């Protein structure tokens, strides 16, 4: 059983599998194709979704086998240090790692998994399937959150 507000006092490395999975807000941004500037290391998001992402629910359709089916897919828990730079600034894993609070729309805070979509944070209605994308550079998006 997950303890209430576990994310406020427990580091990522100490979380149970259940707690770790509960941290995911379901935005789907980690499943978008990204481009990295080789000179600066800056990461750019596209609106192009991985072929395994359900574009309505913003969840992986084959979560257990995703790393085998999509070799570029990062297993966050196993590759957290490398993965952090690829995660959006709103991502709970990144926020907790940086000692920050979760946003009010996060399902753990709001109690409702739809708030991430209602707040316009998820890729619902924005992402397109990779099978229809063509050149990734044609689909760059700015997901930055202004404080």
UniProtKB/Swiss-Prot annotation:
InterPro entries noted in UniProt: Puta_zinc/iron-chelating_dom (IPR005358), UCP006173 (IPR008228)
Membrane spanning stretches: none
Superkingdom, natural source: Bacteria
Family: Belongs to the UPF0260 family.
Name recorded for this polypeptide: UPF0260 protein Noc_1358
Naturally occurring in which organism (per UniProt): Nitrosococcus oceani (strain ATCC 19707 / BCRC 17464 / JCM 30415 / NCIMB 11848 / C-107)
